[in-house]
């Protein structure tokens, strides 16, 4: 342990010495005048140039003498040439001793990795075939005071990558790719829904009654109104109010907050897509979801086969559709239908499976507990799990043929819940009764049970058309499409404990 501590201290001393040297260089720049100029305007991006002139030979580029202005961070400095990186990629810039003044040549020698420079010149190609800018002018725009991570080892400490995402993005192309994909996914989802006549809306983040999901909220206090408020756990009840109001197809992509555990699959602040469409049911949402997921896989990967870890998920095949009840029996052949239909036997099975049984649960909730413990993790390929018991679906419409269950599904891929959807409950009296049942659950010790929302009941009393709604976890979806093992890998700034 002492050896590790000594090594860490040595590294810190070395870094401090490098920072001190860079600060001296910055002081010298300040003495010259403006050390942070802001009058340069580039006309090209590094990777765009690489693509645009990929087929041009050395001779063709020399004859064309194409002028360009680029800027970026120095990632390699060999003296005679540097490699700079901008938001699109990298390009070499050549330090031509014949065209650059002595003062500039001397300055270039003092520049460090991480410094941000501008470069003007003409495009050329090296004998090895690399495209580069033969510089006629180069300037330091921003002096970097901290050294970049060692080029051979990079930024390999996972926690440091999360805490200092700005450094992670500088040095790890894989990280940059992940977040480009995330942006691409969200943009395509938005386009997909707008093309189908959905209206994008925004609903409150601060709510007086946290509703729309079974979760523990973050609580805050509104000073001016002197009242307790909650960060939203879901936008559902507000979106359905909009359907009541006549916006028959709406969606929102935004943050939700749940005051719960942190894991590779859970972050207290996460991004959710929720959409609602009138005159549709949960089966319509299944079809829409399959179509969306296939488009996203094709867009990101060029294929409907999605590699994840040592598995491949097949989005091109029809997603399996199976009820909660049937899935328990399919994946646990030692259990019988009679086991799941008897409350005492179901309670014993749930306890033995490791579920946190409080003792007051009804049969439906016990069945879901059994499903969560014994089935969820086995659902590797895409599965729509349907017919959730009404006890755990307080906002979903009861099934016409079996009122003990609801017209609801959850989508599982790789053993993880990715989406939750149902035909919406639009019976105001039934909704009021279910809210009261949720209040009783909360009084019995269930922190995640819902509050009674009188205004939402009132909205339903005006009449909501038959509607289907769905929520899709954007973070987990991006995890799948980027083969990322942790939700923190796909959130730019995940929540972390403060450093000691």
Swiss-Prot record:
The free-text cofactor remark is: Binds 3 Mg(2+) ions per subunit.
EC annotation from Swiss-Prot or TrEMBL: 6.1.1.6
**InterPro entries given in the database record:** Aa-tRNA-synt_II, aa-tRNA-synth_II, aa-tRNA-synth_II/BPL/LPL, Lys-tRNA-ligase_II, Lys-tRNA-ligase_II_N, Lys-tRNA-synth_II_C, NA-bd_OB-fold, NA-bd_OB_tRNA
| NADP keyword on record | no
A GO cellular component annotated for this chain's UniProt record is: cytosol
Source organism's superkingdom?
A: Bacteria
Query: What's an example Gene Ontology biological process for this entry?
Result: lysyl-tRNA aminoacylation
Q: What is the lineage of its organism?
A: Bacteria, Pseudomonadati, Pseudomonadota, Gammaproteobacteria, Pseudomonadales
Pfam families hit by this protein: tRNA-synt_2 (PF00152), tRNA_anti-codon (PF01336)
Where does this protein hold Mg(2+) 1? 410, 417
Family recorded in the similarity comment: Belongs to the class-II aminoacyl-tRNA synthetase family.
| Underlying gene | lysS
* Main subcellular location: cytoplasm
Q: In which compartments does the protein localize?
A: Cytoplasm
Catalytic reactions of this protein? tRNA(Lys) + L-lysine + ATP = L-lysyl-tRNA(Lys) + AMP + diphosphate
A Gene Ontology molecular function term for this protein is: magnesium ion binding
Q: Which HAMAP family match?
A: Lys_tRNA_synth_class2 (MF_00252)
Give cofactor(s), names only. Mg(2+)
Keywords (A to Z) from UniProt: Aminoacyl-tRNA synthetase, ATP-binding, Cytoplasm, Ligase, Magnesium, Metal-binding, Nucleotide-binding, Protein biosynthesis
| This protein's name | Lysine--tRNA ligase
Keyword Iron-sulfur found: no
Q: How does it assemble?
A: Homodimer.
Source organism of the structure: Pseudomonas putida (strain GB-1)
Q: Which PROSITE patterns match?
A: AA_TRNA_LIGASE_II (PS50862)
Residues reported in the UniProt entry to bind Mg(2+) 2: 417
């Amino acid at each position: 342990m002492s050896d590790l501590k000594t090594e860490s201290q040595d590294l810190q001393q070395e870094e401090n010495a490098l920072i001190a040297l860079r600060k001296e260089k910055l002081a010298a720049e300040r003495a010259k005048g403006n050390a942070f100029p802001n009058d340069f305007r580039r006309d090209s991006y590094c990777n765009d140039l690489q693509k645009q002139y990929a087929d041009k030979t050395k001779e063709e580029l020399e004859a064309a003498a194409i002028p360009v202005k680029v800027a970026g961070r120095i990632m390699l400095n060999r003296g005679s040439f540097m490699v700079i990186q901008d938001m699109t990629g990298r390009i070499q810039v050549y330090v031509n001793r014949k065209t650059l003044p002595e003062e500039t040549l001397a300055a270039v020698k003092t520049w460090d990795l991480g410094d941000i420079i501008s470069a003007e010149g003409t495009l050329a190609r090296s004998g090895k075939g690399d495209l580069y800018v033969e510089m006629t002018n180069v300037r330091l725009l921003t002096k970097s005071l901290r050294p970049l991570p060692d080029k051979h080892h990079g930024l390999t400490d996972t926690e440091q990558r999360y805490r200092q995402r700005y450094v992670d993005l500088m040095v790890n192309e894989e990280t940059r790719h992940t977040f480009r994909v995330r942006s691409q996914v969200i943009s395509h989802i938005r386009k997909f829904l707008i093309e189908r006549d959905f209206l994008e809306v925004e609903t409150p983040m601060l709510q007086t009654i946290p509703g729309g999901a079974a979760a523990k909220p973050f609580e805050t206090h509104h000073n001016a109104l002197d009242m307790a408020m909650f960060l939203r756990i879901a936008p559902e009840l507000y979106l359905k109010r909009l359907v009541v109001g006549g916006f028959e197809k709406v969606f929102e992509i935004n943050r939700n907050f749940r005051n719960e555990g942190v894991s590779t699959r859970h972050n207290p602040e996460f991004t959710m897509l929720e959409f609602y469409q009138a005159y549709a049911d949960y089966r319509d949402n299944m079809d829409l979801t399959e179509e969306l997921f296939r488009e996203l896989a094709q867009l990101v990967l060029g294929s409907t086969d999605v590699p994840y870890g040592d598995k491949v998920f097949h989005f091109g095949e029809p997603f399996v559709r199976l009820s909660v009840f049937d899935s328990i029996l399919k994946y646990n052949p030692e259990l019988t239908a009679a086991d799941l239909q008897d409350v005492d036997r179901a309670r014993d099975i749930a306890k033995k499976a490791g579920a946190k049984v409080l003792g007051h649960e009804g049969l439906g909730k016990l069945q879901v507990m059994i499903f969560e413990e014994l089935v969820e993790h086995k659902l590797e390929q895409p599965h729509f799990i349907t017919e959730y018991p009404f006890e755990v679906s307080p906002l979903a419409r009861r099934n016409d043929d079996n009122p003990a269950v609801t017209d609801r599904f959850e989508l599982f891929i790789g053993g993880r819940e990715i989406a939750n959807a149902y035909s919406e409950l639009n019976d105001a009296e039934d909704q009021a009764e279910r809210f009261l049942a949720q209040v009783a659950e909360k009084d019995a010790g269930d922190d995640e049970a819902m509050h009674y929302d009188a205004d939402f009941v009132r909205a339903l009393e005006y009449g909501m058309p038959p509607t289907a709604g769905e929520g899709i976890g954007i973070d987990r979806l991006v995890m799948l499409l980027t083969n990322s093992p942790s939700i923190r890998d796909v959130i730019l700034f995940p929540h972390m404990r403060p450093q000691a």
